[in-house]
């Protein structure tokens, strides 16, 4: 018998709003509240909000916290020196495969926060504890399941958050992208997101999130589900763990080589040896379909260099055509013509540099 689905503190709000709920990594989450298309456009044109409380915030502290994170992840947290600054990184296994992709916030040398994906949270915590124990790091790894998280995204997102919480504006208005600030006790506002739009991700005590959700709703922020979240992240060229990469995929095979910091030879992060010995056999590219049809994950792609495969695909609400990501033979370049097999027919597609959409506008591809 399967375990019951986990629920976020906003579950009743979703049901009251008529959300279609689905199993997402063992969590009961909203797919859409009505029109997925309207939710997508709300984020691109105005403001939408997502319940992301299924994701786990993990506090990492202790005398060796910085050294531990420099060992744990492929990007180098030593580049973070300003409290509240963050970076994106992959956490690798010894073979160089991606255990998870994370955002890491710096507050002090002995005070960090790591945000991990919902479906990998238990695995991630176990791995973090294993690395800490193996190398004898003096660290405390504290999963914060007492916290909830709401992402408010779109060109008007920040203004609507401030309208709902005027006291937060002074601390959060100066934030640069990938920075966070405490706006009140126990509440962190970060200028981050997963949509390609401006906005905030707000981390706060679980018992305060329902009131925040209702106050944002009163300001005209539209609730959005996983369906819109997926089309938005695809347009923005952002990977989804478990679909575009996993433990068998190296960062270079997922377009994430920019997250691997190799400059400091003395920093032997987990997976570094495998990364340094690895000759990239695949390229990770964007595809835009040139005829009618919708690309989906696992569809074959053929090109002059050989065969590839789609990892993600959808119909882009902003562009009105199907877009996707594919792992292809090395040598495939933006502008190349390829073909995707859709229902037994080979349909032409254009290789594109990511993203497809930036700040609500189509990125030109020739």
From Swiss-Prot:
<dbReference type="GO" id="GO:0005829">
    <property type="term" value="C:cytosol"/>
</dbReference>
<comment type="similarity">
    <text>Belongs to the GcvT family.</text>
</comment>
<comment type="function">
    <text>The glycine cleavage system catalyzes the degradation of glycine.</text>
</comment>
<dbReference type="GO" id="GO:0004047">
    <property type="term" value="F:aminomethyltransferase activity"/>
</dbReference>
<protein>
    <recommendedName>
        <fullName>Aminomethyltransferase</fullName>
        <ecNumber>2.1.2.10</ecNumber>
    </recommendedName>
</protein>
<dbReference type="InterPro" id="IPR022903">
    <property type="entry name" value="GCS_T_bac"/>
</dbReference>
<dbReference type="InterPro" id="IPR006222">
    <property type="entry name" value="GCV_T_N"/>
</dbReference>
<dbReference type="GO" id="GO:0008483">
    <property type="term" value="F:transaminase activity"/>
</dbReference>
<dbReference type="GO" id="GO:0005960">
    <property type="term" value="C:glycine cleavage complex"/>
</dbReference>
<dbReference type="InterPro" id="IPR027266">
    <property type="entry name" value="TrmE/GcvT_dom1"/>
</dbReference>
<dbReference type="Pfam" id="PF01571">
    <property type="entry name" value="GCV_T"/>
</dbReference>
<dbReference type="InterPro" id="IPR028896">
    <property type="entry name" value="GcvT/YgfZ/DmdA"/>
</dbReference>
<dbReference type="InterPro" id="IPR006223">
    <property type="entry name" value="GCS_T"/>
</dbReference>
<dbReference type="Pfam" id="PF08669">
    <property type="entry name" value="GCV_T_C"/>
</dbReference>
<comment type="subunit">
    <text>The glycine cleavage system is composed of four proteins: P, T, L and H.</text>
</comment>
<dbReference type="InterPro" id="IPR013977">
    <property type="entry name" value="GCST_C"/>
</dbReference>
<keyword id="KW-0032">Aminotransferase</keyword>
<dbReference type="GO" id="GO:0019464">
    <property type="term" value="P:glycine decarboxylation via glycine cleavage system"/>
</dbReference>
<dbReference type="InterPro" id="IPR029043">
    <property type="entry name" value="GcvT/YgfZ_C"/>
</dbReference>
<keyword id="KW-0808">Transferase</keyword>
